[in-house]
Swiss-Prot record:
Keywords: Flavoprotein, FMN, NAD, NADP, Nucleotide-binding, Oxidoreductase. It catalyses: a quinone + NADH + H(+) = a quinol + NAD(+); a quinone + NADPH + H(+) = a quinol + NADP(+). This is NAD(P)H dehydrogenase (quinone). Binds 1 FMN per monomer. Residues 4-190 form the Flavodoxin-like domain. It comes from Xanthobacter autotrophicus (strain ATCC BAA-1158 / Py2). Substrate binds at W98.
Length: 199
């Protein structure tokens, strides 16, 4: 049975919700799924004053354990058109895995959030996907089999490069049903691909 890791960083809980949806989709495909987060780099007193969501139940991941999974789905919010430094810092530490080819042929995908529709969703997805491709991973996005990403009836995230959500400038907008379903769909597709490739 394929093992899938949903690896995320979420300051305010939006990406945490998307991670849970992606994990649910991967489980629907029959994969064994773990949800883990990367360590925060923000001092706790600063995180508290900024009202970060500090009660996230997912355990902290280690770089070494990435090699144990058949698929890794990476979720992180956008910071000025790129992935947040917490995730970049974590992935930067995977040079040893890269050097050994430990992630070659594994399946990967990405999801993100932005404050606005034009806040850099696709650029952030590319920044994640670029890392995964350097690791030798096979990338699975949010294909147009998920037709709801084509809706014009409401503000919604979504891209063929990965599931996304829009948070609003103050973070008050929570992931919509369409956005969560997109993450679930992508998680299922990634797990299905991992099962085909790795059993």
């Amino acid at each position: 049975m394929a093992k899938v890791l949903v690896l995320y960083y979420s300051a305010y809980g939006h990406i945490e919700q998307m991670a849970e949806a992606a994990a649910a989709g991967a489980r629907e495909a029959g994969a064994t799924v773990d949800i883990k987060r990367v360590p925060d780099l923000v001092p706790e007193e600063v995180a508290k004053s900024a009202h970060f969501k500090l009660d996230q139940k997912a355990p902290i991941a280690t770089v070494a354990e990435l090699a144990e999974y058949d698929a890794i789905i990476v979720g992180v919010g956008t910071r000025f058109g790129r992935m947040a430094s917490q995730m970049a810092n974590f992935l930067d530490q995977a040079g040893g895995l890269w050097a050994r080819g430990a992630l070659n042929g594994k399946v990967g995908g990405a999801f993100t959030s932005t404050a606005t529709q034009h806040g850099g969703q696709e650029v952030t997805l590319f920044s994640i996907i670029t890392n995964l491709m350097h690791f030798g991973m096979v990338i699975v996005g949010l294909d147009y089999g998920y037709g709801a990403q084509m809706t014009l009836d409401e503000v919604t995230g979504g891209s063929p490069y990965g599931a996304t959500t829009i948070t609003g400038g103050d973070g008050s907008r929570q992931p919509s049903a369409i956005e969560l379903d997109g993450a679930r769909y992508q998680g299922r597709k990634i797990a299905e691909t991992a099962i085909k490739l790795h059993g």
